[in-house]
């Protein structure tokens, strides 16, 4: 039985709580409340009802027959988190945490967002429960994800552009934590990925593991077996932990697809496992992209949801233990995979999800036709249309 996190919030040497003293008590209160509610049947019933009646679960498992035939190898199945209310897996966690905040007596939430999907999910959950919502978002991401910014505002959230650093997810998270330090008495920090100080990586994983649980049962029903490989994109890593969790104790190969940007041998990438070293970011010990002096190197990816310089501590442990393999996918490879899926299956994936698709497509070609690859299609690509228009005008991503 998989034993992590341990009682002090560690995954081997990774994880923990590296935060100002001001936040130790709020974190302990959140951990205590979550432990109490985790096994509460009333809480579970309320959460499941929201997922089924409001978010639209269970999400579909789609056999990508035309792209599988085109590649000539393994069968490719897609776990369709893009079909969730708000368009991605992020709503699974947002609804869980807003319920937790409600049980703790909070009425205000703060959130960070990169691609805007978590911001939209948090704003949606806040609107549903009548909470005040403040979302921190890097100014670079505000520009490239303007549709999601407008969606958040329509949902009643305040969006705070962050101008420090590169104006991306890391910087938005920094500002969200600073704000929480000053307002932790009446605000709940609704974090969006399996990152940050304990208990957040654990909480987010628990609210996302329904992805893998559903997919496992659905695939057994359709194929009578488990997948040979499971592939998911990894920034912070919540959709990946959500789908991997159900297969950790199975004989299934697990692959995380990181953002290689312009290439891992250039300065323009967000490949934390490939190029990172041990350090502390946002309250957690993990791998991060840093220089010899411990200063964080600004990450880059065409995908706003993957350009994070760290990775969830559980992913760091799973890499070091060898249980999960992490591979890098460039911008061009992701865009090519996005185009192929769109043109063969009529499904427009998020650029984040396209990183997982690219790796799955590459592997499928060299596998027998009776083998199965399960891909976490973490979100839909509507939010990326402006980015895609700019990129494709330059002829990027024209082949797989």
UniProtKB/Swiss-Prot annotation:
It comes from the Bacteria. GO terms for cellular component: cytoplasm. Keywords: Amino-acid biosynthesis, Aromatic amino acid biosynthesis, Lyase, Pyridoxal phosphate, Tryptophan biosynthesis. The beta subunit is responsible for the synthesis of L-tryptophan from indole and L-serine. This is Tryptophan synthase beta chain. Its cofactor is pyridoxal 5'-phosphate. The gene is trpB. It comes from Bacillus velezensis (strain DSM 23117 / BGSC 10A6 / LMG 26770 / FZB42). Its EC number is 4.2.1.20. The modification N6-(pyridoxal phosphate)lysine is found at residue 90. The lineage of its organism: Bacteria, Bacillati, Bacillota, Bacilli, Bacillales. Pathway: Amino-acid biosynthesis; L-tryptophan biosynthesis; L-tryptophan from chorismate: step 5/5.
């Amino acid at each position: 039985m998989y034993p992590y996190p341990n009682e002090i919030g560690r995954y081997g040497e990774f994880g923990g709580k590296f935060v100002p003293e001001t936040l130790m008590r709020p974190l302990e209160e959140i951990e205590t409340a979550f432990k109490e509610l985790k096994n509460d049947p009333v809480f579970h019933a309320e959460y499941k009802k929201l997922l089924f009646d409001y978010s639209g679960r269970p999400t579909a498992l789609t056999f990508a027959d035309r792209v599988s035939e085109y590649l000539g190898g393994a069968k490719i199945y897609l776990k369709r988190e893009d079909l969730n209310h708000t368009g991605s897996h992020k709503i699974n966690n947002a609804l869980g945490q807003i319920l937790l905040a409600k049980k703790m007596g909070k009425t205000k939430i703060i959130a960070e967002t990169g691609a805007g999907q978590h911001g939209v999910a948090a704003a949606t959950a806040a609107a549903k429960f009548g909470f005040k919502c403040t979302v921190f978002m890097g100014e670079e991401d505000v520009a490239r994800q303007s549709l999601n910014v407008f969606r958040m505002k329509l949902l009643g959230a305040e969006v705070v552009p962050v101008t420090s650093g590169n104006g991306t997810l890391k910087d938005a998270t920094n500002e969200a934590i600073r704000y929480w330090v000053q307002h932790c008495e009446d605000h709940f920090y609704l974090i969006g990925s399996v990152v940050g100080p304990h208990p957040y990586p654990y909480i987010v994983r628990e609210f996302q593991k329904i992805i893998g649980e559903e997919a496992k049962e659905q695939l057994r029903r359709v194929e009578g077996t488990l997948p040979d490989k499971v592939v998911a994109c990894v920034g912070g890593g919540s959709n990946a932990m959500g789908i991997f969790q159900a297969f950790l104790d199975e004989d299934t190969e697990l692959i995380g697809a990181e953002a290689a940007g312009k290439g891992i041998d250039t300065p323009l990438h967000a490949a934390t496992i490939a190029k990172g070293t041990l350090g502390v970011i946002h309250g957690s010990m993990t791998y991060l992209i840093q220089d010899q002096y411990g200063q964080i190197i600004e990450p880059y990816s065409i995908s706003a949801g993957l350009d994070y310089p760290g990775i969830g501590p559980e992913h760091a442990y799973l890499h070091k233990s060898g249980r999960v393999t992490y591979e890098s996918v460039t911008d061009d490879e992701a865009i090519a995979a996005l185009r192929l899926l769109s043109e063969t299956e009529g499904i427009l994936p998020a650029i984040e999800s396209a990183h997982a698709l690219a790796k799955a497509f590459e592997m499928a070609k060299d596998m027998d036709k009776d083998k199965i690859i399960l891909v976490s299609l973490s979100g839909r690509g509507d939010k990326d249309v402006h980015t895609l228009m700019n990129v494709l005008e330059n002829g990027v991503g024209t082949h797989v």
